[in-house]
Amino acid sequence: MTSGRAMSPEETAPYGTGPARAESAPDAPAPIKRIRTHHLREMKQRGEKFAMLTAYEQYAAQTFDEAGIEVLLVGDSASNNVFANETSLPVTVDELIPLARAVSRSVRRALVVADLPFGSYQASPEQAYLTAVRFMKEANAHAVKLEGGIEMAPQVRKLTEGGIPVMAHIGFTPQSEHNLGGYRVQGRGEAAARVVAEAVAMEQAGAFAVVMEMVPGDVAAEVTKSVSIPTIGIGAGLDCDGQVLVWQDAFGLRTGRMPRFVKQYADLHGVLLQAARDYAADVKAGTFPGPEHTF
């Protein structure tokens, strides 16, 4: 299969080899590596953890890729964080595809995973396949993610048999928040066995990784030991193979009450707020633009 855009030598080279060259200087920088799904499994086997963040546009994607984030998720959380909806339910395929396209065009190394939004895959494996094909063809996504456990195994199997890598999502599934009674931890007590069974079912159906959201840490640890595919936690403790957060939460662009599982690494809201105030003050005071900004 041929991509719709020209690929760089770094992208077409085998993982870790970089572009062909006659001779590499001893102090040459390490070659750029394109992360593939099997590399995440290899990292799990080595006991090496990996990071995943959401991304919805060019500059965040480029920055996170430069930082070495292995996986970027074009999440249905764009519904809240881009389109200002209260939940993830309203966002559509047609809204997410341009975001996924922008992210995939902007990275050189990260694996780009696109969420399948609510209502675009639940009806049948055939519906799931047709939706996923759009993300792969129109957005150049590298993989897709869908929510659900054992009941979604036919969809996962259909996609993987059709050549589309699938990341599963179990535990608390935001698209089912009304059915689950709101934002609640999943897998406590007797329900723990079901979380393990769902992860095993996703692996058997062909998923290359599984996200666990709002699952007790000991249950997530048991899942991680029970499957050979990587586990990715969001509110699922330290023993997962990788972690994922919504970037606006992690870096303080969104304000207000944060979920317990969020650690904020920056206060981007404060930085942008002050910068905007400084800009407005300069304009009102007549000090911008100055001579150095004028032709």
From Swiss-Prot:
Chain positions covered by the region annotation Disordered: 1-30
InterPro entries reported in the protein's UniProt record: Pantoate_hydroxy_MeTrfase (IPR003700), Pyrv/PenolPyrv_kinase-like_dom (IPR015813), Pyrv_kinase-like_dom_sf (IPR040442)
MF-aspect GO terms: 3-methyl-2-oxobutanoate hydroxymethyltransferase activity; magnesium ion binding
Catalysed reactions listed for this entry: 3-methyl-2-oxobutanoate + (6R)-5,10-methylene-5,6,7,8-tetrahydrofolate + H2O = 2-dehydropantoate + (6S)-5,6,7,8-tetrahydrofolate
Subcellular location: Cytoplasm
Pfam family, one: Pantoate_transf
Residues engaged in binding Mg(2+): 76, 115, 147
Active site residues of this protein: 213
Note describing how the cofactor binds: Binds 1 Mg(2+) ion per subunit.
Gene Ontology cellular component list: cytoplasm
EC number: 2.1.2.11
Residues binding 3-methyl-2-oxobutanoate: 76-77, 115, 145
Pathway assignment: Cofactor biosynthesis; (R)-pantothenate biosynthesis; (R)-pantoate from 3-methyl-2-oxobutanoate: step 1/2
GO BP term (any one): pantothenate biosynthetic process
UniProtKB keywords: Cytoplasm, Magnesium, Metal-binding, Pantothenate biosynthesis, Transferase
Swiss-Prot/TrEMBL cofactor(s): Mg(2+)
Entry's family note: Belongs to the PanB family.
Oligomer status and interactors: Homodecamer; pentamer of dimers.
Protein name, per record: 3-methyl-2-oxobutanoate hydroxymethyltransferase
Species in which this protein is naturally found: Nocardioides sp. (strain ATCC BAA-499 / JS614)
